[in-house]
């Protein structure tokens, strides 16, 4: 795994993005933003799920005017998502912690100047959010909806902001497929030091979005690219955070929580392994201490994996072993193994957290 690219550190509210800051995970509400109660409820759900910041759509002035009441009731940093109407950004900037605008549909550059001025006055960062499906006409005509087109748009708009004396910038380059998304980020990364917001847009249902995001975001993270990220899922908000954090952990960018090793099901399994692993996941989700644990369903690989795990279950016929650091600490009936295993995990976390 490569070292992370060194990037400029900016702040979205009190959350650092870039530099040596941890890679943050964010999501976006799907409520009508003007419905303050519904939007606050969704933001609080995301906060509870572990989101570091949240973005809301601002399609109309009524939504922009609701941001004050929303901001007063939440503690997560709030990002306003702006398309088409720059005046919405001017109102939103009074209340939020960051403005995202789409350069492909915001219109004349004089409008971007007004957005920059509003953000400068309030020390707000701006995300230049380039989408392959809505490039500016000149870049679309020259490059089409390609990675090259996204990079050209981003470079042009970054320079435009820099020429105005504005450098609290983060950048995103999103397409609905992995290939263009990854190519665009890889092309742009060596050309500037601004933090990158990673994401594959319009990724689909939880199954397809998880696969696309794991491949695309995982590849970029392994390359050392990325400072904040969103997994876009057509589904429940909490799933975006859950998948995003799992990608960060399994790419090695975050050392937190359990790495659960469990065998694929086969004819040798001598226990209800699927239920056991599901229960282990549920009952240990709160643990932040990094550790490797294994839950194995037969003797073929169980002992070998247990030797390398911090805590392990090795199932046999009707009973099994609980092991800590390769040493057997209990031989128990099958129905008692998970309970003892969880107790040993919590003990290990307490001693090593």
Curated annotation (Swiss-Prot):
Q: EC number(s) per UniProt?
A: 1.17.7.3
Domain of life of the organism encoding this protein? Bacteria
- Keywords (A to Z) from UniProt: 4Fe-4S, Iron, Iron-sulfur, Isoprene biosynthesis, Metal-binding, Oxidoreductase
Q: In which pathway does it act?
A: Isoprenoid biosynthesis; isopentenyl diphosphate biosynthesis via DXP pathway; isopentenyl diphosphate from 1-deoxy-D-xylulose 5-phosphate: step 5/6
One GO biological-process annotation of the entry reads: terpenoid biosynthetic process
Positions that bind [4Fe-4S] cluster: 263, 266, 298, 305
Enzyme class, spelled out: oxidoreductase
Query: What cofactor is needed?
Result: [4Fe-4S] cluster
Q: Name one GO molecular function term.
A: 4 iron, 4 sulfur cluster binding
Q: Do the record's keywords include Zinc?
A: no
The cross-references to InterPro entries, in alphabetical order and at most eight, read: Dihydropteroate_synth-like_sf, IspG_bac, IspG_bac-typ, NO2/SO3_Rdtase_4Fe4S_sf
Reaction(s) this enzyme catalyzes, per UniProt? (2E)-4-hydroxy-3-methylbut-2-enyl diphosphate + oxidized [flavodoxin] + H2O + 2 H(+) = 2-C-methyl-D-erythritol 2,4-cyclic diphosphate + reduced [flavodoxin]
Answer whether the UniProt record assigns the keyword 4Fe-4S to this protein. Answer: yes
- How is the cofactor bound, as the UniProt entry phrases it? Binds 1 [4Fe-4S] cluster.
Q: What does this protein do?
A: Converts 2C-methyl-D-erythritol 2,4-cyclodiphosphate (ME-2,4cPP) into 1-hydroxy-2-methyl-2-(E)-butenyl 4-diphosphate.
Q: Which family does it belong to?
A: Belongs to the IspG family.
Q: Know the name of this protein?
A: 4-hydroxy-3-methylbut-2-en-1-yl diphosphate synthase (flavodoxin)
């Amino acid at each position: 795994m490569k070292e992370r690219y060194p990037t400029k550190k900016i702040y979205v509210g009190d959350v650092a993005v870039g530099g040596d800051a941890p890679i943050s995970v964010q999501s976006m509400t799907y409520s009508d933003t003007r419905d303050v109660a519904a939007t606050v409820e969704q933001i609080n759900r995301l906060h509870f799920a572990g989101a570091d910041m949240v973005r809301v759509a601002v399609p109309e002035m009524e939504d922009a005017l609701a941001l004050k009441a929303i901001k007063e009731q939440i503690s997560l940093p709030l990002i306003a998502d702006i398309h088409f109407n720059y005046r919405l950004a001017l109102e939103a900037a009074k209340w939020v912690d960051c403005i995202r605008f789409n350069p492909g549909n915001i219109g004349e550059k004089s409008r971007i100047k007004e957005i920059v001025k509003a953000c400068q006055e309030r020390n707000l960062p701006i995300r230049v959010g380039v989408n392959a499906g809505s490039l500016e006409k000149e870049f679309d005509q020259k490059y089409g909806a390609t990675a090259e087109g996204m990079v050209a748009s981003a470079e042009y708009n970054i320079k435009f902001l820099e020429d105005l004396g504005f450098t609290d910038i983060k950048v995103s380059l999103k397409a609905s497929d992995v290939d263009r998304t990854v190519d665009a980020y890889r092309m742009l990364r060596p050309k500037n030091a601004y933090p990158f917001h990673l994401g594959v847009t319009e990724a689909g249902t939880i199954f397809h979005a998880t696969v696309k995001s794991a491949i695309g975001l995982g590849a970029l993270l392994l390359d050392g690219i990325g400072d904040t990220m969103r997994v876009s899922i057509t589904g429940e908000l909490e799933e975006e955070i859950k998948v995003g954090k799992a990608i960060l952990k399994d790419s090695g960018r975050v050392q937190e929580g359990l790495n659960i090793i469990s065998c694929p099901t086969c004819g040798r399994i001598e226990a209800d392994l699927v239920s056991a692993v599901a229960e282990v996941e549920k009952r240990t989700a709160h643990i932040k201490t990094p550790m490797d644990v294994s839950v194995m369903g037969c003797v073929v690989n169980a002992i070998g994996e247990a030797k390398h795990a911090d805590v392990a279950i090795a199932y046999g016929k009707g009973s099994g072993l609980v092991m800590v650091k390769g040493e057997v600490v209990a031989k128990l009936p099958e129905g008692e193994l998970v309970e003892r295993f969880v107790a040993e995990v919590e003990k290990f976390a307490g001693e090593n957290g």
